[in-house]
Amino acid sequence: MGFRITPSRSESDEVTQVAPDIAVCPECLRDRKTQAQRLQYPFVNCAHCGPRFSIIRDLPYDRSRTTMSAFSMCPSCRKEYITVSDRRFHAEPVACNHCGPSYYALYNKVEVTDYSELLNLSSRLLREGEVIAAKGIGGYHLICDARNEKAVSRLREIKQRDGKPFAVLFRDIENIRRYVFSNGVEEKALLSWRRPIVLLKQLRPLAPSVNPGMETLGCMLPYMPLHSDWFERLDTPALVMTSGNISECPITIIPEEAEKQLAGKIPLLLHHNRKIHNRVDDSVLQVCGGQSCLIRRSRGYVPEPFFADVPVEGILAFGAEKVNTFALGKGETILQSQYIGDLKNWETFRFYKESLERFQHLFRFRPSLLVCDLHPDYLSSREAERYASDLHLPLLYVQHHHAHAAACMLEYGLDEPIVAFVLDGTGLGDDGKVWGGEIFLCDRREYKRLSHLEYVPLPGGDKASTEPWRMAVAYLWHYYGNEIPFPAGFKERVGEAKIQMLLKMMEKGVNTPYTSSAGRLFDAVSSCL
């Protein structure tokens, strides 16, 4: 008896497994200090770690079908690659200082390619309170010292980001424990090979602009050698690390794009020459009731499949519009895309369409049934309608909040009718109004609306979700009419002219749909406080 290792067969339609990107392992970090060809090498990896989904173009998963095809292995790496007993046996991204990708930067109009010099330069700039950018596994990040208020405020200006909190990369788990409360489940997630951002209750402050007004802090640990190299040269316990793009745009992956967006705003952009084929943001997780709940599923998780308990072959679900992901059905598995974002941004919509095509190609997917949101003006719904017309396929419209309820039923294996409380932002209802605070009697196929929050005006439509004071005025006007008992300081904070304009809009019914949204109720209450 024996076995043979043979070349990968070409194409198969039964593909559902592609590995997500994996944080660098301890063995590879050790190799950077002990192997001559990998001393301080920033792209070290093995069969147990390194880039996967971010570099793959096609299947089967061979180097020639990844962006590593641009780099020919040196004899030493080739020997590891073909040796069955080696940790780098058939590790497709295997590389070293002699043959692999490398970092480079243009600083003061001079190209710098020496990694040690780049490390010293970037560390000095971070120490001096500058904001820099660096290309990582799934895209560019913007980085600064998390203790330096001036640097973090400058980062907010660059990102055009008002109050949304930033994620923080900590030196190690001990420093995380100094700044936040964490339990065993949370630390297990932080230390896992997936390396997500984990939302934790803050214990000590960093710079105020990191997470203004928040009690939680998004924390993660180093997952690339570059991260560890910075902390070896810096005294700070933590760095702000946020996606390297202007707010609402997709994470940047191309050096020329990064330079166009950021040159002149920051002193240094660290590029590397390994192309990113599939952009992936950092994943975000929160532990609720002892269970890990993914808030944003991307790097480290995508494209791992979910297993359904019913056949889903051929279903292509296009997702919603605001925080979009889409999904493909293969057999009894569901393949969900990486986090896409808000499709109203043109660049994000282009990323969405590109990812739709790439997922279908990668997983040899041929749709037979299309599914989209009930809202006809969502760009995802319009894309679904285009597919239906071009491919002559049936299209099923699904009410937004029933989709939420059905997703929970699938996640928890529920197939009997349930009473579902769906508390959400917005979604078009069957009656043409904006739903979001619903009680359904439903199963996975059908639902009956038992009750809902009272309808109130939604002045300005979508604008009310970004200007919460509008909903405060709407609720107060709805219940008190023109004799509104505004909270102390509310008029001064918002402005009398704005309030009067909104009251006239609601009285005349101009751009004022009605909503039962729980999210807008929360907005109203928070704006009154």
Residue ranges: model-predicted function:
Residues 1-529:
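Short acidic/glycine-rich loops and adjacent helix/strand connectors
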